[in-house]
Swiss-Prot record:
UniProt membrane topology term: Peripheral membrane protein
Descriptive protein name: Trimethylamine N-oxide transport system ATP-binding protein TmoW
Keyword Magnesium: no
Naturally occurring in which organism (per UniProt): Pelagibacter ubique (strain HTCC1062)
PANTHER family found in the cross-reference section: GLYCINE BETAINE/PROLINE BETAINE TRANSPORT SYSTEM ATP-BINDING PROTEIN PROV (PTHR43869), GLYCINE BETAINE_PROLINE BETAINE TRANSPORT SYSTEM ATP-BINDING PROTEIN PROV (PTHR43869:SF1)
Top EC class for this record: translocase
Function comment: Part of the ABC transporter complex TmoXWV involved in trimethylamine N-oxide (TMAO) import. Responsible for energy coupling to the transport system.
Catalysed reaction equations from the record: a quaternary ammonium(out) + ATP + H2O = a quaternary ammonium(in) + ADP + phosphate + H(+)
Transmembrane segments: none
InterPro entries: AAA+_ATPase, ABC_osmolyte_uptake_ATP-bind, ABC_transporter-like_ATP-bd, ABC_transporter-like_CS, Gly-betaine_transp_ATP-bd, P-loop_NTPase
Positions annotated to bind ATP: G61, L62, S63, G64, S65, G66, K67, S68
UniProt-listed GO biological process terms: glycine betaine transport
Length: 341
């Protein structure tokens, strides 16, 4: 595995006038209720994790779980109370204001739920604005902005004002603006939550297309589990500032680490989450169906075909080599069973 782009070690964020004193006295054993009784609010409680280059980590939880606070700490929009945060090996908490500004300008892109477009500027002018703030010449910034317009599919609307765009189009401008500075790291805090379901689905598709092309290192905040499942390489589920579980979507659904995670995921349609590789067993040498299926297929996409087979189905890798098998009964049990572990 490559070196982490983002690394957090025992990060705490506690709000309140005596937060540091209480944290010191707690010696790492932070109880949210006890702190609240003493006038402090626990935003992030002992968060430790890494995000590698090109990975998309989706952080999710209910309102007040600490997911947005965690993101703000990692971007240092909010200072952590305690802990270590590294960006490409650089200790974020030791940077002075000038160094922090340079880091944000050159390595970080941010997109929030609020589009925050400048109403008196056109699409291309909004996208070019952060480049001009960096000191890039006007024409060069416009040229770069036009590249971003095409990237997010707004060709022909570059001279529109924000009021002339739909919500989804405005959010595309926000995404293009954040990408214009070519950030290595992309922070997104519920960027699609204000959009209606159809536009939201379109934006998720667009987002996946961009990520496949650009391979950014991403932290994405959402409270929507379906959205997390569609987008994430790994998911972190938070409750009361604590990361309850950080794992692949499949492992979170199949092997919840806590009762809270189990309840969080119990209504998730497994067929939409799991891949054939998550279910396959050792390959049978005989008695296989003629039908073959890739280990990377989402179960929902191939379940109907597998269920028409009487025998186990061969599972293949990228080179069409048989690496396992899956029986139709396994599909039935996984997709339709509601047994509780």
């Amino acid at each position: 595995m490559s070196d982490p782009v983002i690394k957090c070690e025992s990060v705490y964020k506690i709000f309140g006038s005596n937060a540091k004193k209480m944290l010191h006295e707690a010696n790492g054993n932070v109880d949210a209720k006890t702190f609240q009784d003493n006038g402090c609010i626990v935003g992030v409680n002992n968060a430790s994790f890494e995000v590698v280059k090109g990975e998309m980590l989706v952080v999710m939880g209910l309102s007040g779980s600490g997911k947005s606070t965690l993101l703000r700490c990692i971007s240092r929009l909010t200072d952590a109370t305690s802990g270590k945060i590294y960006i490409d090996g650089q200790d974020l908490l030791t940077l002075n204001n000038k160094e922090l500004i340079e880091l944000r300008r050159n390595k970080m892109g941010m997109v929030f739920q609020s589009f925050a477009l400048l109403p008196h500027k056109t699409v291309v002018e909004n996208i070019a604005f952060p480049l001009q703030i960096k000191g890039i010449k006007t024409q060069d910034s416009i040229n770069k902005a036009m590249e971003m317009v095409k990237l997010v599919g707004l060709d022909g609307r570059e001279n529109y004002f924000p009021r002339e765009l739909s919500g989804g189009q405005q959010q595309r401008v926000g995404i293009a603006r954040s990408l214009a500075v070519e950030p290595d790291i992309w922070f997104l805090d519920e960027p699609f939550s204000a959009l209606d379901p159809l536009i939201r689905k379109e934006m998720q598709d667009e987002f996946l297309r961009l990520q496949e092309k650009l391979q950014k290192t991403i932290m994405f905040i959402t409270h929507d589990f379906d959205e997390a499942l569609r987008l994430a390489d790994r998911i972190a589920i938070m409750k009361d500032g604590v990361i309850e579980q950080l794992d692949t979507p499949a492992n979170i659904v199949l092997n919840p680490a806590t009762e809270y995670v189990r309840k969080f995921t119990e209504e998730v349609p497994r067929g939409k989450v799991l891949k054939i590789a998550d279910l396959m067993e050792k390959p049978e040498t005989e008695n296989l169906s003629d039908f073959k299926v890739s280990k990377n297929e989402i179960i929902e996409n191939v379940a109907e075909k597998i269920l028409t087979q009487e025998k186990s189905v061969a599972v293949t890798d990228e080179n069409n080599k048989i690496v396992g098998s899956v029986h139709p009964s396994k599909i039935i049990h996984t997709v339709f069973s509601r047994e509780k572990k």
